[in-house]
Structures are given as structure tokens and as C-alpha cells.
Amino acid sequence: MFKPIISSDSHVCEPPDLFIDRIDKKYLDDAPRVVNDPKRGDVYEIKGLKKAIPLSLVSAAGQPPEKLSAKGARFENLHKGGWDTAARLLDQDKDGIYAEVIYPSVGMEICNLADHDYKKACMDAYNLWIAEFCDPAPDRLIGLGQTPIRSIDEAIDDFRKIKDLGLKGVMLPGMPAIPNVDYDHVMFDPLWQAAIDLDLPLSFHILTSGEMKGMSFRGSSINSGYAIIRANQDIMSMFVNSGVFMRNPDLKIVCVEADAGWVPHFVYRLDHTYNRHRFRLRGAELDKMPSEYFLENIYLTFQDDIVAFTMMDKMNPARIMWANDFPHSDSTWPWSQDLLQKYVAPLPQKQQDMLLHDNVAELYKLDIAS
């Protein structure tokens, strides 16, 4: 029997009034908004994005593969649980899920905006709304905040504001908004320490690094999907190889929706490259092997990665977390129980507990009765 199941990665569908009602008045005329495109249906228009975001795939959970389309959806026909708290709890019940860690949807694309001041205004508005969304059921809706990282001092202040809103963690953009530096720079160490002191796990979600922009792919467009995971792998290896975890051993990073079955080979490759090539490639001298930092400091989420279910013993089972990704097109909702019975029920009880409940509860300090 499973403990109360916690999805480590679920999403909202930002409602049309979210940004219009909450954004800094300076940006009101340019606030992200829902408009109807005659060919594509309802889409989110955001200043600075060349293409509007179609809402159909944002809320396509439960649709059969042959019905999935980026066109034609109307907001009023989407899963109401994407923005309505009461409806969301019913959606959880339908999938046999007790609680969810909540990420944005439109907010993922906002991470990729070039106008960092506008990005900051959008993220501030989202933080206010997601706190309101989660407030009626804080034990079942685990909200995370956002910040663009325009400066270290501002980001630390944002961390404190996010904590004060009752949110449990922070989703960072794949690239910081500070010019000419990346997260491996030592200037970020005070920010990592602030996250540790505030007990805020930091997440990197796929599609927040601009990895799909300006890229060409061999073969058909289906090949583009694999770059999504590689972008997150690059972030994780950067944290490991640059010594971020060595300098900040209590830092907790979550690699979100990039699957996990690749981890055993990836950590082998980290160690191989470190042993054989670190002098030539100017890698940092680490106190432990790269694999040890990866397996201790990085948490990973996945939905239906069958390899991950079968390779728990080859990873750190205390860092692997299942998710249903509701209401996105990759979601296992409303069939999650069928999936879990097939792949999780055969696992040892301890691994079942860690995968579906314990790891998420420990990471976010959740007090959920078993």
C-alpha cells in the first residue's frame, strides 16, 4: 500500500487575469494576456516572445496521443483545476494524488525573456497569485516562487519574500539575468547560502534555458525533444564540475521533468571525464568524486520513465521523486494509479515510500500524515 502520494512536479494554467491584475502598473499595457487566434485558438501573448504560447498543450492531460494538438483550445474548456483551487483538489482525488509541488506553465517561457525588468515584473505577479492559489490547501498544494536573478542582493531579497508568502522553494531560470556570468561563478555563493539558510530548495525545470530557440535539428521535428533534457543535464554537470556543491554542501537542487533513467551512465561519465581529463579541461579540483556530489545534492523528477523505475538501485533512491505533470500533455493523469501499480508496486516498500512520498516530504519539510 502506498503512502499518500505527492507529485513532485505539477503545474498551473495561468488564468487570463493573473498578470493584468497583479503586475506593476508600469507594465500593465504589456502584461501577458490571453487572446484568441483564429487559427491556433486561445494563446498567451507575452511581450518579447516571437510566438504566442498555445494553451492546448498546457492543459492536455488525459487526451489520447492522436488528439494532441497545439491548436484550437479555448480557455473555458481547459482543466479548471489549472487555476481554480477547489477544482484542483478534485483533480488530485481523481488521480489518487494527495499533494502536488506546483510549477508555472506560462512562467516557464517567461524565464526566457530578454527584457529582465519585464521578466521580474511578471515573476513578482506570479508569486502573488500562486500564493493565493495554494493558500486554501497548503498541505496539498506546494507552491514555488520565481526570480530572474538580476543581482545577487535582489535575488536574496526575493528568496525572503518568497518564503514570507508561504512558498516552499524557488524555480530559477536556466540562465541568470546577470550579464556574462553563469551559476558556476563564485559570486553566486551568497545566494546559495541564502537558499540553505531559508530552507528553500532550488529547481531547474526543462524549457527554461532557451534551449529550443534558434536551434536546427536533423531529421524530423520530433528530434527536437531530446535537446530539452540535455539542457538540464548541462546545468547539473556545471554545478558539480565547478565546485558549487563542494563549496555549498547543503545546497539542494532539483532537476525537474528531465527524467532520471540516464543518471547511472551520466555519473559514470562525470567520473571518467574528471579522472582522465580534468587537467587538460581545467576542471575544478574536487574533494569528492563528481558522482558523489551529483547523487547527494541533486534531486530528480520524472513521470513515466520506465528505466528510472527499474534502476533505483543504480542511483540514490533518496533523491528520486515521481510526478504526474498535471495538467500538461506529458501528464500521466488520470491514469497514474495504473502506472504506479505496474512499476512501483513491485519495488521494495522502502523504495516505494521514498519515490512517492518520503523524498518530496523531506525536501520541502512537509508534514503529511501517512
Language model segments and positions:
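Short, solvent-exposed turn/loop segments enriched in Gly/Ser/Thr/Pro and often Arg
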Residues: 8, 38-40, 103-107, 145-150, ...
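Active-site metal-binding loops of divalent metal-dependent hydrolases
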Residues: 10-11, 325-326
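Divalent metal-dependent hydrolysis catalytic cores, especially in the metallo-beta-lactamase
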Residues: 72-80, 90-113, 140-146, 168-172
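Short acidic, glycine/proline-rich loop/turn micro-motifs
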Residues: 111-114, 216-218
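Active-site-proximal gating segment of KS-fold condensing enzymes and close homologs
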Residues: 117-133
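Catalytic pocket-lining loop regions of alpha/beta-barrel enzymes
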Residues: 121, 134-142, 147, 152-321, ...
